[in-house]
């Protein structure tokens, strides 16, 4: 599974995680649907879209890009896709672009062409390694940081997150899905292990049974 697919799975299943990144209250998730949309002229899809599902012209729609490899052409592509999307669909909402990086070293700004655009309030660049994680209310941020956690400490963080989920997520179905997602991330980080081995190694199965 590719890194961007993991993030899109997270946003699909737990959209409050995305809004936590932006410092927006979790109840904003009730106003949005996470989806993808095809751009016909270029035969590609925007895989990360948060589209408003309520009639409020002030609500922005969000284009989300996850970039874990240096790409000098990224902003050329992103802005081309954005403006072609605007021309083709003419959405009734203002746009916001959110780009998620593991760290600043991965970004290629191309400041000659894009410096002024990247400084617009419409564009948010997030560097996961710089996110702070307070002791309380930090479950969404910790979940995303698990993706960049070193292999030798990822298992401990996964177990901590599973235990934190027991306390903070009251809905049993949501909690089960959250722990399954933790397992998926760890299997991605430790591809030599099966999901069953990961669950056994980190006692995630035991955590499930004790809920």
Where are these regions (language model features)?
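Elongated, amphipathic alpha-helical interaction scaffolds
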Residues: 1-211
């Amino acid at each position: 599974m590719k890194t961007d697919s993991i993030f899109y799975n997270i946003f699909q299943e737990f959209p409050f995680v995305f809004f936590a990144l932006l410092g927006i209250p979790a109840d904003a998730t009730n106003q949005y649907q996470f989806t993808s949309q095809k751009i016909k002229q270029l035969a590609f899809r925007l895989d990360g879209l948060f589209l408003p599902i309520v009639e409020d012209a002030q609500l922005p729609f969000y284009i989300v890009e996850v970039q874990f490899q240096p790409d000098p052409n990224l902003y050329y592509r992103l802005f081309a896709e954005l403006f072609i999307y605007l021309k083709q669909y003419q959405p009734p909402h203002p746009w916001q672009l959110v780009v998620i990086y593991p760290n600043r070293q991965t970004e290629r700004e191309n400041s000659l062409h894009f410096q002024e655009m990247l400084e617009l309030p419409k564009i948010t660049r997030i560097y996961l390694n710089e996110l702070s994680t307070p002791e309380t209310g930090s479950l969404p941020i910790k979940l995303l940081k698990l993706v960049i956690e070193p292999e030798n400490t990822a298992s401990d963080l996964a177990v901590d997150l599973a235990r934190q989920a027991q306390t903070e997520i009251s809905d049993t179905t949501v909690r089960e899905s959250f722990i399954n997602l933790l397992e998926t991330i760890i299997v991605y980080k430790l591809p030599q292990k099966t999901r069953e081995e990961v669950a056994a190694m980190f006692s995630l199965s035991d955590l499930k049974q004790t809920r």
